[in-house]
From Swiss-Prot:
Organism of derivation: Mus musculus (Mouse)
Primary localization class, coarse: cytoplasm
GO biological process: focal adhesion assembly; negative regulation of cell-substrate adhesion; negative regulation of establishment of protein localization; negative regulation of stress fiber assembly; positive regulation of establishment of protein localization; regulation of actin cytoskeleton organization; regulation of cellular response to stress; regulation of glomerular filtration
SMART domains: DUF1899, DUF1900, WD40
Domain of life: Eukaryota
Gene Ontology cellular component terms for the protein in this record: cytoplasm; focal adhesion; stress fiber
InterPro entries per UniProt: Coronin (IPR015505), DUF1899 (IPR015048), WD40/YVTN_repeat-like_dom_sf (IPR015943), WD40_repeat_CS (IPR019775), WD40_repeat_dom_sf (IPR036322), WD40_rpt (IPR001680)
Name recorded for this polypeptide: Coronin-2B
Free-text function comment from the UniProt entry: May play a role in the reorganization of neuronal actin structure.
WD repeats: 85-125, 135-177, 179-217, 220-263, 265-308
Similarity comment text for this entry: Belongs to the WD repeat coronin family.
Subcellular localization(s) per the UniProt record: Cytoplasm, Cytoskeleton
Amino acid sequence: MTVTKMSWRPQYRSSKFRNVYGKAANREHCFDGIPITKNVHDNHFCAVNARFLAIVTESAGGGSFLVIPLEQTGRIEPNYPKVCGHQGNVLDIKWNPFIDNIIASCSEDTSVRIWEIPDGGLKRNMTEALLELHGHSRRVGLVEWHPTTNNILFSAGYDYKVLIWNLDIGEPVKMIDCHTDVILCMSFNTDGSLLTTTCKDKKLRVIEPRSGRVLQEANCKNHRVNRVVFLGNMKRLLTTGVSRWNTRQIALWDQEDLSMPMIEEEIDGLSGLLFPFYDADTHMLYLAGKGDGNIRYYEISTEKPYLSYLMEFRSPAPQKGLGVMPKHGLDVSACEVFRFYKLVTLKGLIEPISMIVPRRSDSYQEDIYPMTPGTEPALTPDEWLGGINRDPVLMSLKEGYKKSSKVVFKAPIREKKSVVVNGIDLLENVPPRTENELLRMFFRQQDEIRRLKEELAQKDIRLRQLQLELKNLRNNPKNC
């Protein structure tokens, strides 16, 4: 297979998406005053669905994130309620694709947690998770929900392992142990039968997740891969990374033959990470650079030249990360085909950016809104773990978004276990895993000691009072 070097010049061709343009929301429709995390981990720190926006925030003594109803735009108060149950920095958050108020988070405290957000949003700080999942020995950097199966969650840790969790029982059911360094990115194909990963060991892998077997592997020496995404049903992968000349680069791969990339294209000489986003409905690819304000977009086809440049959205405000609205949350009346939620750290701002196809008619445009994966799962955890693959359940966007009422998350009931040694419950008193957790435990113990000392002092005073009263009674028996 020969490698085709693509020109930087845009290649125009007949396309219904050649005039797509980006439109940033007005300031009153943005989310302002948010203390966005300063963590340098290469994640988006943002997740969005048709009802809520979640953003990882800067906090001391543990990790936290905000969950804001989408209609609550404008300035967010500093004391706005947070989800703050983690003992370490939160590194990734993802909404359940089938249940709008269930969100997963992972943290430096080695745990993965599942949270249930009330329908109207948070009224007070949430510290108790619906589920706490412990299985990694080091920090957990990534979480991903299975695209077609309810209650199957993947987590990748700095222990080089990927754990597959069945949330029906709250336990890990599979472990993928083929990586030799930190996992940078995970992506599923359409039916979730394949998982692709990028890793710090400079390898791109295609994995059968249930068995953990590596089907294809590429040793990317000339194209150091950072991010990867499956391109729908095309049997193609697209990676972003860095070339041997330290320029930002993308590469297109055949998922069944990773010996060489089909094409490579150099983007620019900037140093920020390139985030790829693929829309299988329109076959459009979006490339957004971390630390710059530009979003390039292309159209992908199964025939040469495979990748056709369309346009670029430019903004002077640099982005730290980007959340993406699911298809069923888009405004079809405005011919919106994609929507980003851009994190601008310097301004404490979350800015929605809509990608719009210009059309004169106000009627529903069926040619740009085909049937799309909806909010109903195609499989149960037992079916998927048993080897069944099934395409997503499709929905039409013509009727607009309707909240799913069929899928309900039920946390497994766990019997509390105890191991008592010398009167101490060892499972109740778990040793701290991080320095932040140790400090929190230390200050908590100091407060407890101070409180007990005050109680003891009050009891000493009361005891002396009673002793005096008793002495008086003995000295004056007539007063009895």
